[in-house]
Amino acid sequence: MNHSFLRSVRSFSFLLGMTSLLTACDDDSETASVNKIDLAFQALSDNNQLLQFNANNVASAPTAVAITGLQSGEKILSVDYRPATGQLYGLGSTSRLYVINPTTGVARALGAGPFTPAINGTSATIDFNPTVDRLRLVSNTGQNLRLNPETGTVAVTDGTINGAATATVSAVAYTNPVAGASTTVLFDIDPTTDKLYRQDPPNDGTLVAIGDLGVNATGTAGFDIAADDNNAFAALTVNSRSGLYRIDLTTGRATLYDNFPTNTTIIGVAIPTKAVAYGVDSDNNFVAFNPTSPQTQVTKPFTGLQSGERIVGLDMRPLNGQLYGLGSTNRLYTINLASGAAAVVGAGAPLPLTGTNFGFDFNPTVDRIRIISDAGVNLRVNPTDGVALVDGVLNPGTPSVTAAAYTNNFAGATATVLYDIDSNTDILYRQDPPNAGTLVSVGPLGVNTTGVNGFDIGGTSGTGFAVLTVGTTASVYTINLTSGTATKGADLPRPLQAMAVGLGF
């Protein structure tokens, strides 16, 4: 055998192996094997469609949902879930903010018109700051705004993006996207420089480089961070193919999970937030908690109330996702979801109320607050000016209703049913018709509850949730709206008075 030939073959094999190794190293961010996690998310395509994927399989094409309710020719540029309510928000190209139903695709504009200053650029991205419940907007020209998610207006115009001369930010995301978060960090993705940045401080717009993505991304990116573990994911277009990438927030490295279906270009990623509800504890603190795991709570004192006043009722306004509260001095308040600050509605004149415990819930079809009490009071209140209409006293007999909730708890609802809990008879009633105050028995709760309770119905799930105190134990219950049966879930650390569930749940 020719030994010279063997040496040549071995040399060629070595060089071929080294070339393959170097090529593999160069493409590591795209080809590395990853342990995929089970994580559902919404993806926004470049043609105004929502697609629900799971991170462990984005190659299979789900049924797309067309986004409707927009202005003529308008496109949704970016989407994100609001941690304080669980609702999906979208940014329109006409400088409008929308709440979008992820199941139907129906978009509802917030505010009377486009916000000002308008979007400056051909692309823009949004993400919620969970510590202050405001939307960060950054455009490809460096515009840097804070938006109010309840009014759809610009809250503050912040400093233009700076610190990286050639950077063109395409996607942003905050860490710790949970209601009541006390800390958060804002990260930016720039497909022009193919880098991950930290925007620090966010209001100044200063970019601090974290590291290279390790891929050559083009076009518009989508980016979001999961609430459970701060896992970060981005939709990036690489080699003309849109794919889901996991982003290392420490190094900036992008690792390909999988490509999205062929001919699908994804420009936005939104990971659902954790379920959230709000209540009031015995010390008159504002409490945020997950109704499925309520032992962990975020507690803040209410501010802006009258001396010695307590909040005795809570509910979210379906029209705009704003939280309202009823004070023990019979005043109506709006409540800041991030801080617990209360602001009186209207002239602050006391409502014509009597009683000790109250039901307090929005009728979504007419945008009015129903307030009822254990003394039989039955009111309709305008949430804009606090003016009340007195309806028929609760009947028959002398019921002791201490909680109330309407079904179809979302803006634009055309029908709704009002349910009441009587803590004296421990029965769920249907109030029908509501204005007449007539109670129709649905069925027994099956537990002996006190008047210290709260009740709400999820705007998306349609599930009845209640916080009930039975004996000395306070727990979260689900309420069967057909039979009245209360099914116990997890225990609470302490009893809560009043309850409002995030509209996205």
Language-model regions, residue ranges each:
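Sec-dependent bacterial lipoprotein signal peptides
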Residues: M1-T23
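Bacterial Sec-dependent N-terminal signal peptides
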Residues: L15-F41
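N-terminal segment immediately downstream of the Sec signal-peptide cleavage site
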Residues: V34-T68, E74-I76, T85, R253, ...
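Conserved beta-propeller blade signature
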Residues: A40-L44, Q87-G90, Y98, R134-L137, ...
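Structural motif
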Residues: N47-F53, R96-N101, Q143-N148, T193-D200, ...
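Short loop/turn segments that connect beta-strands within beta-propeller blades
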Residues: A55-V58, N101-G105, N148-G152, D200-D204, ...
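A short beta-strand motif characteristic of beta-propeller blades
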Residues: P62-Q71, V106-P117, V154-G163, T206-V215, ...
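Repeated scaffold domains used in trafficking and secretory/extracellular systems
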Residues: G73-D80, F115-F128, N162-P177, N216-I225, ...
